[in-house]
From Swiss-Prot:
Assembly mode: The basal body constitutes a major portion of the flagellar organelle and consists of four rings (L,P,S, and M) mounted on a central rod.
General function of this protein: Assembles around the rod to form the L-ring and probably protects the motor/basal body from shearing forces during rotation.
Protein name per Swiss-Prot or TrEMBL: Flagellar P-ring protein
Gene Ontology MF: a single term: structural molecule activity
Pfam family of the protein (one): FlgI
Cleavable signal peptide: 1-21
Tagged with keyword Signal: yes
GO biological process per UniProt: bacterial-type flagellum-dependent cell motility
Domain of life: Bacteria
Amino acid sequence: MYVFKALAGIVLALVATLAHAERIRDLTSVQGVRENSLIGYGLVVGLDGTGDQTTQTPFTTQTLNNMLSQLGITVPTGTNMQLKNVAAVMVTASYPPFARQGQTIDVVVSSMGNAKSLRGGTLLMTPLKGVDSQVYALAQGNILVGGVGASAGGSSVQVNQLNGGRITNGAIIERELPTQFGAGNTINLQLNDEDFTMAQQITDAINRARGYGSATALDARTVQVRVPSGNSSQVRFLADIQNMEVNVTPQDAKVVINSRTGSVVMNREVTLDSCAVAQGNLSVTVNRQLNVNQPNTPFGGGQTVVTPQTQIDLRQSGGSLQSVRSSANLNSVVRALNALGATPMDLMSILQSMQSAGCLRAKLEII
């Protein structure tokens, strides 16, 4: 009996070290409480000669003519305006949940013409619309550009992006979105990642605190919670629920590969079984030279001919089998993979082959 209790205590201690508590607010979001995208088209003025070349971007000139017409200024027909201080831009913003009229939000300004830089520019009043073509905000202000660049004598240097910037609190909410919050007797909590175990643990935690039947797990991502009627009551109820803590079990073993950048990221649950790996390097070198052949005798009537000479060299190196030991934790996995001496691009192929052979104990996701 004493031996059994001791073993049970050891098992519980191990489980406690594997699981850790997190708040429900960090694991879920409230269904329907989300941001909405806004977009608009406008003009940026005040650029130091780095704006659109209006002869190549006719929409910039057309927009400027329309704006001046609305301000009571008529541009003579046929006028060829060659401006350098104006740029056509797209303006985007996120409409936050529960936004009220008069509230300010940040906007992102991006050049859509051939402007060289938006540094020092001012965005003129731009209406921001939603997917329903209704205007929800008005944007205007000075643009903050994080990049810097300089050019002289045909040489140039640039740090970061110059054709995009941000205006902090650059838009004012003019129209409020209707919300259904507080109208019903149930609210759905959406898990950030689908997990049947986590959905059931959140359900059990709410039922223990609020009584049986207060929460129901609908699927691996949705937990439905019964709430009192009224906005203020639901706000207090959700505030209490979101601060509850639940034990988070170890996540699924996963390896994420970015095929564009060659980066490989894996979590701590990844393990390896013993296997042997042979990775050969194949290199192709193409050398092309242009030879100029001229006639030997001057004035002989011959022609100068340019003939290309191409040389292709194909080499293959490596390919010897290397043993990969069984690894039970992330540090061991890293050491085992580093021992192969493979580049990140080679490592992508190796991990795919390991999974096909059943040696990689993890899900493989390629983005």
